[in-house]
Regions:
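Short, flexible coil/linker segments at or flanking structured domains
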Residues: 73, 81-83, 198, 203-205, ...
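Short, surface-exposed, polar/charged, turn-prone segments marking secondary-structure boundaries
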Residues: 47-49, 122-126, 237-238, 244-248, ...
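Extended, charged amphipathic alpha-helical segments
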Residues: 170-269
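Short secondary-structure boundary segments
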Residues: 34-58, 224-241, 357-367
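Short Lys/Arg-enriched alpha/beta "domain-start" segment
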Residues: 1-206
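Membrane-associated alpha-helical segments
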Residues: 241-361, 367-368
């Protein structure tokens, strides 16, 4: 079993953020949502929070809202009654729960393990998303809550005691690997090295360790880093969704391409399939561009490096490459279907011309007048 050397360490101040990302539709009219939220004065409803960090340029700026609710117990920890809601124009929503950290450091492993695919939080977060969709339904284009959810944990440690000679991120890698992986069973050296390999620091007193299940942040005022990680998690969800949609589009495109044509096709039947495939291709390309171009990091190379590390850990480049490849394949299918439809139309025109010529020749053999 896992034996912690964190026993002598105590967290003085910290927060665990449990983030759940959902997709609720094709797009969201943020201005309309903003007006609706501003006009809603009912207690316990959504309210605005601070704007995006200064180094961020969102296009357009997502809505960051707060919502009151009851606390949830996870082991010995209680969530804050205030839940953070982020709404993106490309159809994504995140629900973030906060757990105060102010006790033995070794409790982080238990909390990380308990939060991994935590059913009560998954159920509660989906319920909040369903309520949100009901509230802003008219502001959502093609509203539909996807089955997929992308959850992520961020442990932000501002201070701990007693002071250590070496920073924890260099002297306690084994223990931190257990926190990052949410695993109490002993880990192999290779697993420990992999879990803690994506590490970045700006100064001597801060560090960020980024893994696929969670991240551990050391230092004060790490909200910018947290915001980058939250967006990367949303981007991962959207890439997964888009990749799955393109798989379906490719299957439907291949089926339409290989479908045996009718002997006498109805007018416009080929155009219908071609238009449908073109719409799937355009939808995929637009969503890809909107997601990948939403966040711009202005004048802060450190945050840009944090994003690159998160992208590396989440394999976003591999998802991007897969999506671009499938978009190209879908375009190829569209071109083939379009060419086939054009050929079909030309063949029909040729037969019409042949029939007209035959009729004109046949008519010439029959006198049209009387005696």
């Amino acid at each position: 079993m896992y034996a912690s050397s964190f026993t002598s360490l105590t967290i003085n101040k910290g927060t665990c953020y449990a983030v759940f990302a959902y997709d609720i539709g094709w797009s969201i009219n943020l201005e309309e949502v903003n007006r609706r939220i501003t006009a809603d004065k009912e207690p316990g409803r959504l309210r605005h929070k601070t704007r995006a960090p200064q180094y961020f340029e969102y296009r357009p700026v997502p809505l960051r809202l707060m919502q009151e609710g009851g606390s949830l117990a996870v082991g010995q920890y209680q969530s804050s009654p205030t839940v953070e809601v982020m709404v993106y124009d490309f159809g994504a929503v995140t629900i973030t729960y906060r757990f105060a950290l102010d006790g033995p450091f070794e409790g982080l492993v238990e909390l990380s393990e308990s939060l991994y695919e935590n059913e009560p939080l998954l159920t509660e977060s989906r319920m909040r998303v369903e309520q949100l969709v009901q509230t802003i339904h008219s502001s959502i284009e093609r509203p539909k809550i996807a089955k997929e959810v992308e959850d992520y944990l961020i442990f932000s440690i501002e201070s701990y005691s007693p002071p250590q000679v070496l920073p924890l991120w260099t002297s306690r890698e084994t223990e931190l690997a257990h926190v990052l992986r949410g695993e109490r069973t002993p880990l192999a050296d290779q697993e420990i090295q992999d879990a803690t390999s994506c590490r970045i620091s700006y100064g001597l007193e801060d560090a960020a360790l980024i893994d696929w299940h969670s991240a551990v942040l050391f230092g004060k005022e790490m909200d910018d880093v947290r915001a980058v990680l939250e967006f990367a998690n949303v981007e991962l969800l959207e890439m997964r969704m888009l990749d799955e949609q393109l798989d379906t589009a490719l299957d439907e495109g291949y089926e339409a391409l290989t479908r045996k044509p009718r002997l006498l096709p109805l007018p416009g039947s080929h155009d219908k399939d071609t238009t449908y495939i073109a719409q799937l291709q355009v939808d995929g390309a637009l969503l890809f561009e909107r997601v990948t171009n939403t966040l711009k990091l202005l004048g802060d190379q450190y945050l840009a490096r944090v994003y690159r590390l998160a992208s590396q850990r989440f394999h976003l480049e591999a998802w991007d490459a897969s999506i671009l490849r499938k978009l190209e394949t879908l375009e190829s299918i569209y071109d083939k279907m379009s060419n086939r439809a054009t050929t079909r139309r030309m063949e029909v025109l040729e037969w019409i011309i042949i029939v007209l010529i035959a009729v004109s020749i046949a008519v010439s053999f029959f006198p049209m007048g009387g005696h």
